[in-house]
Each structure stands twice: as structure tokens, then as C-alpha cells.
Amino acid sequence: MRFLKSFVLAVFLVLISLNPPAWADETVRIQMVRLQTTDGVTLTGVLRQPHTVRNNAGVVMVHGYSGNFYSGIMAFLPEALSDSGFATLALNMRDHDRGPKKNRFEDNRYDIAVAVDEMARLGYNPIFLFGNSMGTNRVLYYSATTGDSRIKGVLLTGPPGNLFEWNISIFGHEAASQVLDQAQDLVAKGKGNQWMLINLGPLGKALYTANHVVSLRGPKTVSDPYKNISQIFKPILIVHGLADRLANPDVTDRLLKSAAPGIHVTVVKIPGANHGFSGHQQDLVTAANKWLIDQTNR
């Protein structure tokens, strides 16, 4: 069934790419986009533009590890938000899907920047950032590092927290440290581009370069969400399923405590919802819609 859904969606995306932008149900314009980052990487995504945009608001939507712009949460949330009147741009990051990973985490800022630039070029204001799973680390980093004044708020779902700590929770401190030590040793020897076979537990195994490992988990990583959220001075929504076995719901509590003083952080915890919000999609949609409406009406 999952293969069939993926096949049907792939065919749909091909049809979009071969035909001019169309109006779905005469209310939402759907368009395949290809954007080039300032460092020369071409990214693909889907832009959804409602005929009537609620308060002229747009949402840039960022997937998590091994994800893409059309599966998992990205298969339903961008569409649901556009049906509610918000323009959405769901874009592949440069390390999308389950292929080998060689980029550094910090390169993600170029991917998010080109999406924000595109939404601003199209005239959307305010613009919000959405991140799912490891995408939460990406959008928190972008917001904290750039201080982009075009971003009016940040939405997070299923945040995994500090990525080295996540590995410790799966494999224990000794095993997680051994992998990081090996990667750091390779980088120190000028072999940062050497491939390593990395065990990701419930996510399977993947090829990472040593540079990629260190950029995600090293002591100087910029991916730490607890540090980054403390540097964000915009409203934040965090939605977490209480049955999430991939990203501990306690991470949300720690993010709340780490936020800058006086910043309004809304937390929604959904009983029974897992990491992908299976069977609870509407709960997530409702929470995101309510928060966005509240923010755009201010």
C-alpha cells in the first residue's frame, strides 16, 4: 500500500512538472518549483497558493531526516494548510531521502534561505517556518543564526532534540561516543570526506562522511536546538505526540524551558499520536491552523 501511494504521488508530481500550474478544486494553485541556492544547489519542491490567502501569510515547510517534500507529514500538512488559506512552499533539503549524506548541517541555511526568498519575492508577508523531526533543528538554526526579520514565527513538530543525545538514548553513551570519536579523528587527519557506515537504530543504516557526522553531533555543532531556541525572539509552536517513540516528548518540555525569556511558546501534546501523527493528522492540522490564525490576526 505504501509503495502504491508513493507511485501514485510520483506520477502526480510528474504530471505537475509537465503541465502548467493548475488550480486544484479551483481554490489552490499547485506548482512544481526548482530553486537554486546561493552556493549552487538546485532544490525541488511544491508551491501551493490559495486563490484567497489568509492575511497574505506564507509557510516554508522543512522535512526531517531522510524525508522529502511529499511524504510523511509533508504528504498532508502543506495541503491542509493551503486549504485553510495559507500559501505553502514544501522544499527538499539538499540531504533529502535516504541517500548518502556528505553535506554539513550548517549548509541547510542556504536551502531555507532560498525558500524564504522565493516566498518573499511572491509577496507573502508574514512568513512562517515549519520544521518536522530533524527539520526542527534546521529551522531553529536558521532563525537563530540569521535573525531573518521576514520570519514572524516558527512551528515545530516531533523535535528530536540534541542529535548526539538522541544517539546516546538509542545506543548508550559509550557506543555513541565511539562513532563520534572516530569521525572527529578522521576530520583531524584531513579525511573529513571519508565515508562511514552509521547505525541509526530504528532508522536503519546510512553512509555519512566524517564531516557530516561531526557537523551533526560534535561538541561545536550548530544543530543544538536548546541553544538555538534561546536566540529566537518570535512566537513558537511545538506539537508533539505523546506516543512518539522516535523523538521523546520530554524534548518539548526542555525546549520550552530553553526558550528566551518573554517569548511566547505554545505547546500542544497529542495523546496517542506517534512520530508521524498516524491517526491523528487532523489533531496536528487543527493545532497548526489555530496557531497560524492567531498569529496572523494579531
Annotated model-derived regions:
Residues A24-V53:
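N-terminal cap/lid segment of alpha/beta-hydrolase-fold proteins
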Residues S66-P78, M93, D250-V251:
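The serine-hydrolase catalytic nucleophile loop
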Residues M74, K234, N248-S258:
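Short alpha-helix in the alpha/beta-hydrolase fold that links the catalytic acid
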Residues P78-R98:
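Conserved alpha/beta-hydrolase
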Residues R94-F128:
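Catalytic nucleophile-loop/oxyanion-hole region of alpha/beta-hydrolase
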Residues E118-A120, P126-Q182:
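Primarily recognizes the serine-hydrolase "nucleophile elbow" in alpha/beta-hydrolase
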Residues I232, I238-H240, D244:
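Short beta-strand/loop motif that positions the catalytic acidic residue
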Residues A273-D283:
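Catalytic histidine-centered segment of alpha/beta-hydrolase-like enzymes
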